[in-house]
């Protein structure tokens, strides 16, 4: 072999090695961005008419913070502020429906998105030594505290949104909006007891739900003036795609949380490949199809199995991919503060 050919082959081999090394270093966040993050900074819900919402934006901020991606963080935050921030309320409009003439006709907020954004901004301020992020998060927290945490039946309650959930005789609650690592994080940051009390009451609510054949958390619950907690009649009585985040957040804060016991018992009734996607907690009727990838990762987390960094396929829509990412961060107890 001539020296020239040997040199050429060596260069080719080196380039192949570099290419393979770069591919190996790609993270789940890199793949997630490619699949669900637009060039402008919106997270696209591929399973819901390609809308964007504060849930997705907050997840995008969280993931970019975890992977130390300041460029994506800034892009996502700028899009969220430009398109979803409600100056009058000081909160974020819950959804951007790009297929409609007015993408933000519904001005209501979704409190889980606001809470996650506030927490992540505060954590970003710490990690990247950016006081503007911290102040922005604290300002949003203040609005949440003053408008979305109410006392009802002598207990603090987190409203799912400003509009439609609080009535004279009852309040409707989404248990998955109690993001326990976030509540713990902001409690440690602010030293305000209200956040710890809210977290504690959230756990009491999910264990107090009456009239259930299946004792896991439903997607929506109702608290009445007498302090009775029951499955909301405004939605199907299911534990499904919302409620699956409850054990995820419980584990994230404390993998030994006693509230996980019923979830472990439920999951252990099925093999991983035959666990139903949802169950009606009143009737016991189960879905006729099984859990998809994101839900299965939550199951794996709760059952004490190792959770690896996710690898996505074309079958994974936005929500399944997001659940898988959240589960990985929960397994790592990312940003947790004991």
Predicted region positions:
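Bacterial N-terminal signal peptides that target proteins for export
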Residues: 2-11
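Bacterial N-terminal signal peptides
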Residues: 10-21
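Sec/Tat signal peptide C-region and signal peptidase I cleavage site
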Residues: 22-26
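Extended ligand-binding clefts on enzyme/binding-domain cores
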Residues: 27, 50-54, 112, 135-307, ...
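N-terminal carbohydrate-binding/catalytic regions of secreted carbohydrate-active enzymes
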Residues: 28-114, 312
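Short glycine/serine- and small hydrophobic-enriched flexible loop segments
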Residues: 61-66, 116-126, 181-185, 248-252, ...
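A generic secondary-structure signal for well-formed alpha-helical elements
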Residues: 68-71, 84, 125-128, 144, ...
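A generic, well-ordered mixed alpha/beta core segment in the N-terminal half of proteins
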Residues: 108-145
